[in-house]
C-alpha cells in the first residue's frame, strides 16, 4: 500500500487557507516525500527564487556579491546569507532593526534587491522565528506560570485515511513547538505587529497538532519584539472535518493519479 505523507505545516496550502503559497509547491513536496515522483525541492525561498532567475540576472547578482563568474548557485545563496542575513539574525535586535540592517546591505545591490528582496525577507522571518522560539516559550512559561516541555522533541505521525481498495493511505506528520499536560503549544514570531487573533491558516495547523496528539486544547502564542499575546484554542471538529474534506480532494485530484 502506497503511503501518502503530508506534513502539518503545509496543510493550510493544501486546504486553500494559505493564499500566499502556490499549490504546486505542496504537490511536488508530497509526491517527493511519499516517493511517488522524484522532485527537487528547494530548501529555502532564496534558493527557490534563484532557480527561477534568468542567466543574465544571475551574472549581475554574482558581480554585486563580488563572486567569480563560475560560482555555483549554492555559493551565491551562501554569500547572500553571509552578506545580507547574518547581522539581521541577531535575536537581541528588534524586528524593525533586523529589516533595516538587511535593507542597508541591499541598497548597494540593486539587481539582488529587485529579484530577491521578498524571498530573502521570508527566509529571514522564518530563521528569526526559529532562533527566538525557545526564548518566547520561556517568556510564556513565566507569564502564565506553566511548564512547556517536549519542545520539537518528537515527530508525531497519525493516519488520516485508508483507501477502501487498499491502494494507498494518507499519513499526517509534524513536530510541535512545545506541549504540557493540557495543551499543544505553537509560537509565531510576527515581523510588523501582533494580530491579536488566530488566522484561519494557523488554525489548520493547530487542529492538526491536536488531532495527532489527542489533545483537546492548544495554546497559540504570537510575539512581536518584547510584546506577546497568547490565546487558548479548543479543537474545532467542524473546522477540522472541513479541512479533511479539502485534504482528500487535494490527494485525489493531485496525488493518486501518479501512483503506479
Where are these regions (language model features)?
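Charged, glycine-rich intrinsically disordered N-terminal tails and low-complexity linkers that flank
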Residues: 1-139, 143
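Nucleic-acid nuclease catalytic cores
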Residues: 126, 144-259
Amino acid at each position: 500500500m502506497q503511503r501518502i505523507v503530508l506534513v502539518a505545516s503545509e496543510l493550510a496550502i493544501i486546504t486553500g487557507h494559505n493564499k500566499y503559497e502556490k499549490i504546486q509547491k505542496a504537490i511536488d513536496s508530497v509526491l517527493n516525500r511519499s516517493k511517488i515522483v522524484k522532485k527537487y525541492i528547494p530548501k529555502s525561498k532564496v534558493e527557490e527564487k534563484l532557480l527561477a532567475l534568468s542567466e543574465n540576472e544571475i551574472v549581475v547578482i554574482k558581480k554585486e556579491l563580488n563572486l567569480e563568474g563560475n560560482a555555483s548557485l549554492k555559493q551565491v545563496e551562501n554569500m547572500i546569507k553571509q552578506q545580507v542575513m547574518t547581522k539581521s539574525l541577531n535575536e537581541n535586535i528588534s524586528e524593525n532593526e533586523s529589516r533595516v540592517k538587511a535593507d542597508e546591505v541591499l541598497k548597494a545591490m540593486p539587481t539582488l534587491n529587485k529579484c530577491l528582496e521578498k524571498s530573502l525577507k521570508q527566509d529571514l522571518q522564518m530563521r528569526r522565528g526559529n532562533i527566538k522560539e525557545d526564548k518566547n516559550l520561556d517568556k510564556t512559561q513565566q507569564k502564565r506560570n506553566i511548564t512547556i516541555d517536549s519542545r520539537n522533541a518528537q515527530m508525531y505521525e497519525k493516519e488520516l485515511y485508508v483507501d477502501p481498495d487498499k491502494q494507498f493511505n494518507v499519513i499526517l506528520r509534524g513536530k510541535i513547538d512545545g506541549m504540557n499536560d493540557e495543551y499543544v503549544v505553537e509560537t509565531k514570531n510576527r515581523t510588523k505587529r501582533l494580530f491579536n487573533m488566530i488566522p484561519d491558516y494557523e488554525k489548520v495547523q493547530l487542529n492538526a497538532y491536536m488531532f495527532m496528539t489527542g489533545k483537546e486544547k492548544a495554546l497559540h502564542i504570537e510575539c512581536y519584539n518584547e510584546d506577546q499575546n497568547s490565546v487558548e484554542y479548543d479543537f474545532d471538529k467542524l473546522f477540522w472535518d472541513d479541512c479533511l474534506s479539502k485534504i482528500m480532494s487535494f490527494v485525489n485530484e493531485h496525488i493518486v493519479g501518479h501512483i503506479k
